[in-house]
Amino acid sequence: LPPQIRKVAVVVSPSALQIKEIQENGFDIVQIHGQVLPEALETLQIPFLRAFNVDNMQEWERYEAEPKCIGYVFDAVKPGSGETFDWSSIPNLPEDGKPYLLAGGLNPANVGNAIEAMHPDGVDVSSGVERDLEPGKDPEKIEAFVKIVRKA
């Protein structure tokens, strides 16, 4: 990959050993879902994005002062399920100047409304651009998604 493309490892409740392996394998950022164990945070030498499920957001304040935390990802209750959530259900967005991404069931049909409602700094998509009948991503859905994001 060209050096300007940042490589992000997406993990759930990583151990210190997993963090070490991620760093040794050339990732630039870690996106952490689940628990952030103290020993993993101590091992972390690259920046991370802290992901929160919308039903469990009471922790984000502890990351405001964490210098390694460069932003947040707000995701649905069941990440990776393709299910969206009520974007107005996020009561207080962080006001610490760190960017936040919106995730959770985004697809070409709803991403424009999501951006309009939440004004995120970016969006995160996976299942919303999957092929309908076979595994993998659908290039046409990706193109439609990107076009809508750029217009929003």
Question: Model-flagged regions — what are they?
Answer:
Residues P2-N110, E130:
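Conserved anion-binding
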Residues I70, P139, E143-V146:
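Low-complexity, intrinsically disordered short peptide segments enriched in small/polar/basic residues
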Residues I46, R150-A152:
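Structural alpha-beta junctions
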Residues I32-L37, V77-P79, A117-I142:
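Glycine-rich phosphate-binding active-site loops on the catalytic face of alpha/beta enzymes
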Residues A103-N110, I115-V129, E143-R150:
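C-terminal active-site rim and adjoining tail of enzyme catalytic domains
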